[in-house]
């Protein structure tokens, strides 16, 4: 199957998962998976959230951002990492994360897949 994101409807989700500004995405859903091409404008973010019953994989296409992640042990320290085009991010089931566009002038564009486990 080929998914042509640019031919699908663009969804605009304000304050997605408690984040800042808007998250824009072209999305594909079936019974088991959510796959999307996402876009965060400068200063926009996806809020910190936990993956229960799923994991998430993100491949950064362009821009730069900040990933905040925490293991399933909620007493553990949150880790912060800079992400750049070409980076692949993985959030296992039970872990939490957020993604912020830290650029002042470039969108953060990425593919993401959330398979049901």
Labelled PLM ranges:
Residues 34-52:
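Conserved short histidine dyad/triad with adjacent acidic residue
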Residues 37, 50, 61, 69-71, ...:
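Residue-level recognition of conserved beta-strand positions in structured domain cores
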Residues 84-85, 93-117:
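Ligand-binding loop in jelly-roll beta-barrel domains
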Residues 55-85:
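A short beta-strand-loop-beta hairpin characteristic of the jelly-roll/cupin
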Residues 37, 80-82, 96:
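Well-ordered beta-strand positions in beta-sheet-rich domains
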Residues 1-34, 47, 80-81:
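A short, N-terminal "cap"/entry segment at the start of jelly-roll beta-barrel domains
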Residues 42, 53-54, 64, 95-96:
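A generic "binding-loop/recognition-motif" signal
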